[in-house]
Amino acid sequence: MKIYDYNGKKNICGDRIHEARCKHRLTQSDLAAKLQIAGITIERDSVSRIEIGTRFVADYELRELSKILNVSVGWLLGIE
């Protein structure tokens, strides 16, 4: 499978995830723990890689991130 980049990044939501996480005063470890409670297997370093754009984000991860961060998926994708 070929891996594609968009403007040098593997996702378009990392900046928004970082913004929302900081607004809620969560650490990357806190966010990873909340995702794990929701059934998503993810570690702190993966959250970091998502935020800097070096890791893809699956649709089910995006859905849970939007719930945890109390924002819409559209906002995370930059279309709202």
Model-found features: residue ranges?
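A short, Lys/Arg-rich alpha-helix, primarily the initiator
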Residues: 1-24
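Short helix-capping/hinge SLiMs at alpha-helix to coil transitions
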Residues: 8, 37-38, 53
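Residue-level signal for the short linker/turn that defines the boundary of a DNA-recognition helix
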Residues: 12-15, 25-26, 42, 57-60
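Short alpha-helical DNA-recognition segment
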Residues: 25-49
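DNA major-groove recognition helix of helix-turn-helix/homeodomain DNA-binding modules
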Residues: 54, 58-75
